Amino acid sequence: MTIEIARAADVAGGEEILAPDDWYVPAAPEALTDRRVEITGPANPAKMAIDALNSGARGWLADLEDASSPTWENIVWSIRNLRDAARGTLADTSPEGRAYAHRGDIRRPIVVTRPRGWHLPEKHVLVDGVRASGSLVDFGLHVLHTARQLLANGHGPYHYLPKLESHLEARLWNDVFTFTEDHLGLPAGSIRATVLIETIPAAFEMDEILHELRDHASGLNAGGWDHLFSLIKVFRDAGPEFVVPDRASVSMSAPFMRAYAELLVKTCHRRGAAAMGGMAAFVPDRADPEVTAAAIEKVRADEQREAHDGFDGSWVAHPDLVEEAERLREEVPPDRFTTHFEPAARLIAEICLADALVDFLTLPAYELLE
């Protein structure tokens, strides 16, 4: 019943483009082969960007979306800071006169920039009198000012793509990437993208999204909180069987969230892509050891669960959590799902997982809220 309701809500449809099993995304560039722990944070102010660069994380999600207020000044400064970071010249001075810069004795993280989503306009850039998409403004400015330097550094113009709802949006991004490489003289396939699967329509099209990105695909990310919001939004009028408990009571251990995570990992590893876990959104307090201990314990639980689920890496929100997350990743190697088994068995397993994506009835008892 649930899968039929999902199809009626237009979240499980899509083109039948994936009959062959023998396709894979290209091998990850060397800079993206180890993504065990990535730190997230804005690219402006410069001090926060420098903190991310000095965190010791494998990667830095330089966030122009959720972690950044989309004012024009903020966007421009973010791009400037990313340019200077690529050049190795990013520096800042506090009002008290303290200087900050990237430390040469610490591993420099690979920068993976997240532009705004397609739905957010940029009023300061008009195309034929119409506001441009903030996603294209952010991507275009970033690639124009950093791509060649990043490639010279042995990295590349790598991006996270947020809020996709369809493989058609991935197709559009692929066209944008190809156009950009052609017009800027960048090597084909040097622009790489990891797609956030944070809407229920995208959860039904993970294979299609990777297929559309083709040579520009790097992986998928499980954006659990946004995915849960998408479920609530899409099925808000679908009837009592689609009522979920208070959001704070629904964790990644809920059956429909487990199905989402498992299907993402299976899809990525079958296609040779990286499966990135979600945010460990707990922040330590250097002035309060008890708060810090609680945050580390929650991060430990998240990291262990994701490693056992087969995720290749995950995010943390604070530099003080990087070392603990790295240590846990070394302790618990990922249990990768097999990429080779009988097509019929795989199809049955994935139909069951797809059905479970919208099965809100199989939930433990929760306290009812007034």
Regions found by a protein language model. Give the residues of each.
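Conserved alpha/beta-domain cores
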Residues: 5-25, 29-30, 39-44, 48-53, ...
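Conserved functional loop/turn residues at catalytic and ligand-binding sites
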Residues: 56
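Active-site-surrounding "flap" and adjacent substrate/cofactor-binding loops of secreted or lumenal enzymes
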Residues: 72, 76-89
